Amino acid sequence: ALSEYDQSLAEAKRTNRMVEALELFKSVCNNRAFSETSIMLFLNKKDIFAEKILDSDIAAQKPFADYPGPPKDFNSGVLYFIQKFKDCLIDDDFNDSFIHVTCATDTNNMEFVLDSTRTIIMTDNLRRSGFLGSR
């Protein structure tokens, strides 16, 4: 979740949750088994993130000391973490992929996300069946 940038794992107190998410994302996305697969990244709990950054500076977290700021700025914080996830990719091609900043309790937002997900699945299926060119 986007809001977990200042939290540690319950099972490994020294491991930052966002760092763990970045490492897992990198591992999955750069696996050859997924080389022809579109990527959908959901950065959830944007509502909690928006509240949390008012009191918990991103740059104050050791793994994210390079956050340029400004502090307490929702959009800058979101863009910073989106870039962190993009930086995990060996192949910089994010054309057929989508990043969604979500709040699961926001029905309008989730409706848009589900529509985008359907589009990704249909596009991948059309590509695999030969109706669309390869990436």
Task: Describe each region flagged by the PLM.
Residues 2-135:
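Conserved GTP-binding G-domain of TRAFAC-class P-loop NTPases and closely related GTPase folds
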